[in-house]
């Protein structure tokens, strides 16, 4: 089993690590630091010692304490001699014991006789002992003749004088023989039952055992010797010299209702089915307890020793409606702890599989060497970040990206003056915020690229904030200095407003004017980078286990899951066993950014590895471990934790949230299956699509993954109504296309992220309810009202504005207030029907269902126009 560290024991018990180290050293363990690991058995002993304050038996030999060892050894030797002699010559043993214990027996005989008298009196008055015997222990009384008194007293004295409480093997064998003889004698005896009364002249031997043991009817072959139950009340002694483990072959007698001395008094219990021991559970008041961050109500109640209903009622009194399966947040846990008067220690269950925390970096200075600096290039979209890196690498990466914008995180190695520099190129598009944050967190120096003709833009500000949050040095590269519209002073002024002050203005930030097109200032930029790296004194230990960051991951045909990494400490070699989040495996192959095979990747260098069990999440920390088993355990624990966390989301809502939940259920959703070429792009797309929503519509990503579109994706889409499959930088195969056509599933692929987002916006707009607006057609004044039999009222009007159309919607307005809305039922010009009447003409207007028209009212005509909604 895996060893347990001291700090883990301290965290579980809620103690400081120093206290645990002190307690461990009290047990004789040589613990020096909290990171020392011990075996699980030793950890359990430390735990027991701290909880009970009693030194475990296994550690007593390590502690030097004054003990009376000499008398114990003498007693043991004497006992062994007596047992051996008892086997060979029982009669000689009795005489020997009588001589050794002669003086002690005299005193003991008197005590035994007094006890015998008391027992006989108690036997005649069993009803007076009913209440007392419940709290006291019971035993056996062996009634024998006087000839065996000395032998009995010798045995009794041996038990009393012995420091060892447990019964030795020889005594157990003799007792077994005695009880087996008793069984045989019972078979020989007649069926009629007799009651026995102990004589005053008989001596006794009492054997007391724990209450859990049952005693059957016991008698010996000798007719003059009978075993009776001892119902005498004894003063309860302190359980200092009582052995917890008693012989299993002796059971406590369970008599029937007749009682001792009456007909049918004591019965034998079947030996085939021994009675189950009933453990008496004592409810202990919990004063302090360790609680995990994510705990359900019933789990919390179990931890603090309260009933679930009690906890739920307490929460109800605090204004929280919960069920037993609901999760408690930290605030609720602290409030409940205060209510119940319990001290809590909130722990994080994720620490159990935090392999990064368990990773110990070697700090031996003799093994530390200077490593390559890691530089991240950040800035606004289309400001020339990738073009600048292309000039440094003498390559053309930007031209190969769709739309001329970077949509992947790339890691590249460059040599300058015999020294290696690792560059990370991040996207500038607003959708790739997570990628920029990830790049800033694993870098040593950040280069912010700003176009001289464009100035500071939103993503420029965001990149600066990421760099400041990461606490890394910033170098400003003013690009496109070869353009006529270049204005570096404008850039410096804008950045100065953000507290990025140039060195020449008295600040601490280096500004370098460069041109990715002509190469101007590139050498100066690299010199400043190396100078800054020297100031930082970047060092790492290449001899330790490797620790790396995954900046991108994907699935490649024929290779499986691949990951782009930057090693931060140690050296990663081919064949190393690694774990990264839920992914683990053995490194089968490694290559650099140009595809050249590598055998090892040193600290500060980047590369691509193959061999992970699945696509690791971008941003995960990759650690090399000793064995495959250890890696698998870490990954499986993380997977199970994430799965349980996802499945056990709380369903409780407050009254304020209830309306929002109902409204959420009424939202229209666009089901989408999303596939991308790399993990980083998939993450950016998911974040962008989830933002495309309003009070009426949203995007529901039913499945997402890295890799090509498969037939299972088509099957899932066909099972979901009105769903579409979106692919980014991937193309479906012929079989998948045919399958999609048969199932009626639409597949859309893109290679530019904003094209995908624009199309999804258009789809969402089509699903939204159209925007209805009114268009005013005209207005007419009622100058006469005519009542026509069987038809109703007809208004004689003069059109004052626009036109009045037959069938148009109208409003009847009186004193500026709308009194009726309806449609034009009839429209006539003199006696002829008309489709419309223009301004300045008289007409007769009939309004459907309206019989309350008056002279001086106005009729307003309008029509409703529907417009397509957009997100």
Curated annotation (Swiss-Prot):
Residues 60-101, 184-203 are annotated as: Disordered. Residues 404-408 are annotated as: G2. Residues 73-101 have a biased composition (Basic and acidic residues). Residues 479-482 are annotated as: G4. Residues 61-72 have a biased composition (Basic residues). Residues 425-428 are annotated as: G3. Residues 370-537 form the tr-type G domain. Residues 379-386 are annotated as: G1. Residues 515-517 are annotated as: G5. One of its GO terms (cellular component) is cytosol. InterPro entries: EF-G-like_DII, EFTu-like_2, IF2_II, IF2_N, P-loop_NTPase, Small_GTP-bd, T_Tr_GTP-bd_dom, TF_IF2_bacterial-like. GTP binds at residues 379-386, 425-429, 479-482. GO terms for molecular function: GTP binding; GTPase activity; translation initiation factor activity. It is found in: Cytoplasm. Signal peptide: none annotated. Keywords: Cytoplasm, GTP-binding, Initiation factor, Nucleotide-binding, Protein biosynthesis. Disulfide bonds: none annotated. Belongs to the TRAFAC class translation factor GTPase superfamily. Classic translation factor GTPase family. IF-2 subfamily. One of the essential components for the initiation of protein synthesis. Protects formylmethionyl-tRNA from spontaneous hydrolysis and promotes its binding to the 30S ribosomal subunits. Also involved in the hydrolysis of GTP during the formation of the 70S ribosomal complex. This is Translation initiation factor IF-2. The gene is infB.
